[in-house]
């Protein structure tokens, strides 16, 4: 972590995961194009459990959600920037596009919309008695993906796929979203209208 003038870098013991620049005279407009949220991926459920437990202890408003293929919680920073904290859980299921919508299939074959409340007690069962909630993020923590608000999902897909070269992992006009990939990861870039 470092701070110099109006800039700061945040990380997990290695390279910076996030660079911040303070611009005190700028006004924030919600719902415009730009950042929707960025996501921090934890190496395992135990580390995510520590992060979520810390939010609970600090009474920081967050929204634990079970996307089946990931366990996650959402929160906003003081300026309203969306943040997702998550860990992968592919053993629980996967997502597909069906009838122009994103759906998830659990490992047992049952279907879900992937937006269920997270069972936080089950998540907290991964904590150990000596886990400290005030420890820094583990070094394996990284930025998992970024979601952008876009004016038109198809135009954005045409650009990021056709010009930049991302793979299209899924596109839903019903949900007004797209998941784009590089190297097979489910979506280092998400697009939402």
Task: Show which residues each predicted segment covers.
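Vicinal oxygen chelate
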Residues: 14, 39-82, 90, 150-157, ...
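Conserved small-residue-rich
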Residues: 135-179
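N-terminal beta-strand motif that seeds the catalytic metal site of vicinal oxygen chelate
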Residues: 35-40, 90-154
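Short secondary-structure boundary segments
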Residues: 16-61, 65, 111-129
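Short helix-to-loop capping/linker segments positioned immediately adjacent to catalytic or ligand/cofactor-binding
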Residues: 61-64, 130-136, 166-167
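Glycine-rich loops and low-complexity Gly/Arg-rich segments
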Residues: 43-46, 62-66, 87-90, 99-100, ...
């Amino acid at each position: 972590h470092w701070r110099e003038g109006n800039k700061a870098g945040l990380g997990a013991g290695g390279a910076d995961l996030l660079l911040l620049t303070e611009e005190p005279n700028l006004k924030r407009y919600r719902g415009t194009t730009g950042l929707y949220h960025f996501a921090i991926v934890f190496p395992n459920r135990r580390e995510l459990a520590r992060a979520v437990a810390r939010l609970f202890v600090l009474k920081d408003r967050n929204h634990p959600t079970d996307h089946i293929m990931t366990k996650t919680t959402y929160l906003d920073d003081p300026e309203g920037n969306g943040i997702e904290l998550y860990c992968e859980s592919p053993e629980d299921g996967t997502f597909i596009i069906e009838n122009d919508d994103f759906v998830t299939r659990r490992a047992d074959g049952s279907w879900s919309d992937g937006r269920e409340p997270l069972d936080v007690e089950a998540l907290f069962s991964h904590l150990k008695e000596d886990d400290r909630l005030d420890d820094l993020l583990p070094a394996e923590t990284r930025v998992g993906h970024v979601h952008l608000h876009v004016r038109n999902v198809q135009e954005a897909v045409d650009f990021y796929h056709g010009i930049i070269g991302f793979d299209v992992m899924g596109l839903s006009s019903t949900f007004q979203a797209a998941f784009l990939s590089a190297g097979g990861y489910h979506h280092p870039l998400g697009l939402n209208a």
